[in-house]
Regions:
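Alpha-helical transmembrane signal-anchor/signal-peptide segments
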Residues: 21-32
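C-terminal motif of bacterial Sec signal peptides marking the signal peptidase cleavage site
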Residues: 11-14
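Residue-level detector of solvent-exposed, low-hydrophobicity positions
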Residues: 22, 51, 57, 67, ...
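Bacterial signal peptide processing site
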Residues: 16-19
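Positively charged n-region of N-terminal signal peptides that target proteins for export
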Residues: 1-5
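Mature extracytoplasmic domains of secretory-pathway proteins
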Residues: 31-95
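C-terminal partner/receptor-binding element of secreted or periplasmic proteins
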Residues: 95-124
Length: 124
């Protein structure tokens, strides 16, 4: 019985934290959609403890405005954030800083401790 209790405690401790998210409504981007390119690789750690990297040269299309910033969807590829579940994620940038993610399947915003992102604006 004691071994079963220890196994149960270890199992519960091994579960990942849920990705923090709050409801969010995407609004039209002022000035219309644009594309940016990340000019320098960005590495960061999510609140759940998982690491992610946004590659230099990756391109992102502005999809909408949130109170926290502008949501950018990857032009080619998919970005995910992970906790207890894996979520498709779009970057949310505010003034050259990555401030979180828009989770399109959940219509939600997930905040991040801000990280500086160097970008080049591309018109397409």
């Amino acid at each position: 019985m004691k071994a079963l209790l220890i196994c149960a405690v270890l199992f519960l401790c091994a579960c990942s934290a849920e990705v923090v998210r709050q409801p969010a409504e995407l609004r039209k981007v002022p000035g219309g959609p644009s594309v940016i390119e990340v000019s320098k690789q960005v590495k960061f750690t999510l609140a759940t403890g998982y690491d992610r990297t946004v590659a230099a040269g990756s391109r992102w299309r502005a999809m909408g405005q949130l109170p926290a910033g502008i949501a950018y969807k990857p032009v080619n590829g998919v970005l995910t954030v992970e906790g207890a579940h894996v979520h498709e994620a779009w970057l949310v940038l505010d003034g050259g800083r990555l401030v979180g993610f828009y989770l399109p399947a959940d219509n939600a915003f997930s905040p991040l401790n801000p990280v500086q992102v160097e970008t080049i604006k591309r018109e397409e």
